[in-house]
Amino acid sequence: MVAATKRRKTHIHKHVKDEAFDDLLKPVYKGKKLTDEINTAQDKWHLLPAFLKVKGLVKQHLDSFNYFVDTDLKKIIKANQLILSDVDPEFYLKYVDIRVGKKSSSSTKDYLTPPHECRLRDMTYSAPIYVDIEYTRGRNIIMHKDVEIGRMPIMLRSNKCILYDADESKMAKLNECPLDPGGYFIVNGTEKVILVQEQLSKNRIIVEADEKKGIVQASVTSSTHERKSKTYVITKNGKIYLKHNSIAEEIPIAIVLKACGILSDLEIMQLVCGNDSSYQDIFAVNLEESSKLDIYTQQQALEYIGAKVKTMRRQKLTILQEGIEAIATTVIAHLTVEALDFREKALYIAMMTRRVVMAMYNPKMIDDRDYVGNKRLELAGQLISLLFEDLFKKFNNDFKLSIDKVLKKPNRAMEYDALLSINVHSNNITSGLNRAISTGNWSLKRFKMERAGVTHVLSRLSYISALGMMTRISSQFEKSRKVSGPRALQPSQFGMLCTADTPEGEACGLVKNLALMTHITTDDEEEPIKKLCYVLGVEDITLIDSASLHLNYGVYLNGTLIGSIRFPTKFVTQFRHLRRTGKVSEFISIYSNSHQMAVHIATDGGRICRPLIIVSDGQSRVKDIHLRKLLDGELDFDDFLKLGLVEYLDVNEENDSYIALYEKDIVPSMTHLEIEPFTILGAVAGLIPYPHHNQSPRNTYQCAMGKQAIGAIAYNQFKRIDTLLYLMTYPQQPMVKTKTIELIDYDKLPAGQNATVAVMSYSGYDIEDALVLNKSSIDRGFGRCETRRKTTTVLKRYANHTQDIIGGMRVDENGDPIWQHQSLGPDGLGEVGMKVQSGQIYINKSVPTNSADAPNPNNVNVQTQYREAPVIYRGPEPSHIDQVMMSVSDNDQALIKVLLRQNRRPELGDKFSSRHGQKGVCGIIVKQEDMPFNDQGIVPDIIMNPHGFPSRMTVGKMIELISGKAGVLNGTLEYGTCFGGSKLEDMSKILVDQGFNYSGKDMLYSGITGECLQAYIFFGPIYYQKLKHMVLDKMHARARGPRAVLTRQPTEGRSRDGGLRLGEMERDCVIAYGASQLLLERLMISSDAFEVDVCDKCGLMGYSGWCTTCKSAENIIKMTIPYAAKLLFQELLSMNIAPRLRLEDIFQQ
């Protein structure tokens, strides 16, 4: 940044010097035209921080939640506002208003337990939901304000949170980190994120073709507040049918259209095909269906459909009513029918049919399911809104039942106060919301929606892993199927989704991440837009006759035809002009589609969009003056929108635009300019320096490893008590930064250290990416980290008034504590700072033996017997007690948390990685005296084998080394931003100026012989991350140990001190070697040898020398077999299969 300002100053001075008037009269001045912009090319990235202040990254979650709390809740209440009683017609209860977290009377918010306290005390961070109600009591109508009906979990940093708009000092008071992204919930003390869910868009027609079966189908998923259903228009043997789940069989399309009131075949033909003869030829065959079935009137058609409806209702309707009901409410449910006027629905079905006919005529006219414009992203707000509405309906139902129960009794009916029973059910809403968020299972009765894995625990491995989790998109696609379509990188994802950040393995391409400048829209009202369209010259669809429908472009609002327009281009331009002047919401998109002759307007939520600079007449509208005002704080990002300099485009509208990547590329026909090209990457991929010089999978690997790097987590990391925390002791910010690093504040909470690296071979312990580390560097703290583990204990209270207690420590005859209790304090808890070794106790808890007995009312002072239930430390290395916290949980039980700390220095086998997807383990640690050094006496911290470069092609790593070296010598932090950054020539020039080699190679001397090495060595700083995979956590061996109860074989897994299994493949290998005794020893003697008595005669097993089958003891032979084999034989016997052992003597006499 400093360097940039210096450069800018010199630039301005030059202009002052050369301000001679005659120079300016020449057409070209200093290589620039007069009309050229000054310096904007470098400066327009200042729009990025301005954008991230208002939108982007985590703001999507917050906006969505705020919209739900402020707008959606009120809509839900309005839809379900009345509760009436079946018993007493006089009674009613009406919800007037709803608020979260603040009462109507006082302007202040309620006191909420601060989020940090909720984390420590295992509570839920939530605010009360208040309603104002009006109801009858006897003859009176009563208004009641601020009735609490439950508690709503609050998203951190949303507008109902304490941290909303808090400055740094207030954050510090609340023990919160100002850089923490927010956007998650705290439920029972754990941080839960609702991931962005990806789905196909609702209420839109999607045409697909199945080439194998030769089927073309158009489907639309209708989603309303009451129901979700899918309607298909499909082809079968060249004829077209309508299909719906609630109708038993497919119905010919002509009959459906007749049922909707379009009776003449000519009109059906006009609606579907217009004047296009080729479409008419394809469609004509469908008109015969109705005459075959003798259906000519609307009533006949409705009866035909009614007969086919699957009935689920209790009261019987006539066939005609069934048909009307099906067409009015079931088929294409998102269109409402008023006064039995089916015209709109007929047009919609005709449009679907037309799309099918077009696809039959031209197979290219089908839609792509994986195209980003056909997808919608669901955010936390929408998901909780569905959940809350479900719970609220259930709450009202239970409420009504309990009111009816009371009103039925004749004596109580006079003065019944409904308020008394509202509190009984209020727990339903609270626990329903909490359960859904903590388990991640969304099950809604109305939609038959069952979804698992919606929420995840926020990963706090590093600051980046938490941030990356907020931008993750999970798609509801089965991971097991190996389909390449949805996993592929779509061109429409450009700028919307990060190209590099996706996991490898089965979820590859299904789990995506948002790019840096994306925003996800929320719903906007449709009605005003509809009116606006009619004002701008759209003819209302209900007034157009069928014949002229297809002569002009159709206008669609959220997929529904609302009219037609004669001059589409003019209409689109006018509409965009209104949007740019701020008369219409900036997130509404409009685009024309010439293939379908349609103009589409979209106002629905869940579309991905991103901001672009508007270009008019070959000039970027953002001028230098605007950027200066932005830097001075006179303008913010919203002003740029209002002034019509910047606008949001979604994927569909991007297809209508011509976008320049750089200002120098602008030609007159272009419509937009990218704000910055590097924003096609997301937050995690933005950390990589010079990613455009790397092979693409390397960037993908780094995205996965950057989330596992140990570093600083948050400013409040020492106040937190998490299950497992990894912290680096001396994190450094990288020498080579990127713009993204500054934007997401990674330089304030970094995860890694700048290591001096020599690229050379040393010792042979560096084969296959292993690293050679310098022992002295480790002594000085390179790569040192600490782990913190939490143990939680609850002191329970039992029904019979007994409770768990913490005992004191035991002492020996000298008055010293016994070895097991050495780390305890006098109160029976570990003392802070004490060392705990494996086998020592650090919480000395005792439990009453009679806790299960019934409460004893008579003799209260019975002496309670306790047995010890201490918490014992188990671990290969000793730990230190870091914090002890005592508190009270929600249900008034004492809660004790102890945090254990371990300091770790790097050892052989610990995993490191650079920022270019090059991971390696530490292969050997060498003393500084034996390491090579250069003529200034600098010794590398890491020696890396040069064979890591050729096949990986990570040129970015080499450039990072040169930039970092130049930065160190020059005293600046260099930039390795994608598609930009510090130029290699400039860096090399700095190296030469400072007396180093142009290519970053140095002369090194051997540390062993002191002679000069025979080659120049590539030598300089590279940013290295220490990953969470450490040997100490994985090391495992076993000689003897526990065995499983059932099979009597050694247990499995490191945590249970399990054995190492010699599996099937290893067994085959041993057989191939012919080492049969080894096989016997491993698979039986050392595993689960067992002596059985086998009867030679019948081949079944007996016991203690007696064959139970033959009832004799003659032919019993003792032999050793694996216990698992004996178990198998007995299990087979229980299933009526008799495995008989045929024995023969090996050593025949």
Swiss-Prot record:
Pfam families: RNA_pol_Rpb2_1, RNA_pol_Rpb2_2, RNA_pol_Rpb2_3, RNA_pol_Rpb2_4, RNA_pol_Rpb2_5, RNA_pol_Rpb2_6, RNA_pol_Rpb2_7. It is found in: Nucleus. Zn(2+) binds at residues 1095, 1098, 1107, 1110. It comes from the Eukaryota. GO terms for biological process: termination of RNA polymerase III transcription; transcription by RNA polymerase III; transcription initiation at RNA polymerase III promoter; tRNA transcription by RNA polymerase III. Keywords: DNA-directed RNA polymerase, Metal-binding, Nucleotidyltransferase, Nucleus, Transcription, Transferase, Zinc, Zinc-finger. Coiled coil: none annotated. It catalyses: RNA(n) + a ribonucleoside 5'-triphosphate = RNA(n+1) + diphosphate. A zinc finger (C4-type) spans 1095-1110. InterPro entries: DNA-dir_RNA_pol_su2, DNA-dir_RNAP_su2_dom, DNA-dir_RNAP_su2_hyb_sf, RNA_pol_bsu_CS, RNA_pol_bsu_protrusion, RNA_pol_Rpb2_2, RNA_pol_Rpb2_2_sf, RNA_pol_Rpb2_3. GO terms for cellular component: mitochondrion; nucleoplasm; nucleus; RNA polymerase III complex. One of its GO terms (molecular function) is ribonucleoside binding. Its main location: nucleus. Gene3D superfamilies: 2.40.50.150, 3.90.1070.20, 3.90.1100.10, DNA-directed RNA polymerase, subunit 2, domain 6, RNA polymerase alpha subunit dimerisation domain, RNA polymerase Rpb2, domain 2. Its EC number is 2.7.7.6. Present with 1950 molecules/cell in log phase SD medium. Belongs to the RNA polymerase beta chain family. DNA-dependent RNA polymerase catalyzes the transcription of DNA into RNA using the four ribonucleoside triphosphates as substrates. Second largest core component of RNA polymerase III which synthesizes small RNAs, such as 5S rRNA and tRNAs. Proposed to contribute to the polymerase catalytic activity and forms the polymerase active center together with the largest subunit. Pol III is composed of mobile elements and RPC2 is part of the core element with the central large cleft and probably a clamp element that moves to open and close the cleft. Component of the RNA polymerase III (Pol III) complex consisting of 17 subunits. This is DNA-directed RNA polymerase III subunit RPC2.
